[in-house]
Curated annotation (Swiss-Prot):
Signal peptide: none annotated. It comes from Leifsonia xyli subsp. xyli (strain CTCB07). Its cofactor is heme b. This is Peroxynitrite isomerase. Binds 1 heme b group per subunit, that coordinates a highly solvent-exposed Fe(III) atom. One of its GO terms (molecular function) is metal ion binding. InterPro entries: Calycin, Nb(III)_bact/plant, Nitrobindin, THAP4-like_heme-bd.
Amino acid sequence: MIEIPTDLPAELVPLSWLIGVWEGTGVLDYAIGDDHTEREFGQRIGFSHDGQNYLAYSSTAWLLDSDRTPLAAESGYWRLSRTLIEGDAGPGMLPGVGPRPFGTAQSVEALRASHGGFDIDVSIVHPNGVSELYIGRVNGPRIDLATDAVVRTAGAKEYTAATRLYGLVENHLLWAWDIAALGQELRTHASARLAKAE
């Protein structure tokens, strides 16, 4: 059952099923030429909000070995895709001017897209010098994302595109992540099944 926090901004209701801490296991499965990497990992994901028009996201993953060897970390922000207006904060630390937009369920309905769901923007930063901007859609308990841009530092490994799929199935968060990296075209990379921990 999905519980919507009473202090949740109306604009975040389409993403509300993500809120909380999720933990579970997954499989890393990626091939580069004749080299094939297949490992099991543990993961902890958190989605939270601070009353603004976005969800804060964080993820840590570790190998399922005796040392729980750290595997990956990422953080970012998820929000409905729309043009920001005077009532929205930013850029930088500039406060919004005037009333906050999309404060009611009725006004949020105006953002519903022709596909029946809502378009979303997701920005994710990795500590290895890669930043991703995803565009996609949330339609009920399913989210489809594809990179619109990938930015890398000069020393980062080659990484050019990705897609991600998230879904709520039998009260578990399932996800799959395909990447184009290290000279390879877009292909299967990792997936996991997570249960709500908090």
